[in-house]
A protein has these predicted regions:
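C-terminal His-loop and adjacent cap/lid subdomain of alpha/beta-hydrolase
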Residues: 1-197
Length: 197
């Protein structure tokens, strides 16, 4: 993809001060500068820029590096269908030595800080709880070669009416051997990520 160019500079504290902060030339100077860096393909600056772009280009190939992607299924800000699920599929297509575990957590969303508020406290569970588990799992993998968990859906239960205290029944652990009905898989023949409901 092409680089993003700011057209309106509105990062003032409290929001944009006035509509006049828009750049009348649609940030042409910045775009032109990037284009001039990229265009002369054989200059040192252009080669360095292209190398940098290639190093971060999204291919999904982690080159066999272990990784855990953890995502709340109820995340409305960063939806799983447009981020983690396709990345998991891209990784499985392009990384023959894949060590990626994808953990999807129903009833978890983007903002754990909101969990004390009415409506959030009865409908969602804390994703941070699973972040801690994922970090421990990765630590154990890196330190003692413990197996990473298979990709899976972790079956959580929201607290419900009155928001009673969380229990282990609400937030079961990431399973080292998930049930077949909870396992996330990739079908290479059809290039399809299969996510249990």
């Amino acid at each position: 993809g092409s680089p993003t160019i700011a057209v309106i500079y509105n990062n003032a504290q409290g929001g944009p001060v006035t509509h006049t902060v828009a750049n009348g030339d649609f940030a042409f100077a910045g775009a032109d500068c990037l284009r001039q860096l990229w265009s002369p393909a054989q200059t040192a600056a252009a080669l360095a820029l292209r190398q940098g772009v290639n190093e971060v280009k999204l291919t999904g190939n982690l080159r066999g590096k272990p990784a855990i992607v953890l995502h709340g299924r109820s995340d409305a800000l960063v939806p799983v269908n447009h981020t983690s699920r396709p990345y998991f599929g891209l990784n499985k297509l392009n990384d023959p030595a894949s060590k990626l575990s994808y953990i999807e957590v129903p009833n978890a969303q983007h903002f754990d800080a909101f969990l004390s508020l009415g409506g959030y406290n009865t409908s969602f569970i804390p994703l941070h709880y699973y972040t801690q588990q994922a970090l421990e799992l990765m630590w154990n993998h890196l330190r003692s070669n413990a197996a990473l968990p298979p990709s899976q859906v972790v079956r959580t239960t929201p607290r419900g009416s009155g928001a009673p205290d969380l229990t282990a029944a609400n937030v079961p652990p990431i399973a080292s051997t998930p049930a077949a009905a909870d396992t996330i898989t990739f079908d290479a023949a059809t290039r399809t990520v299969k996510i249990p409901d």
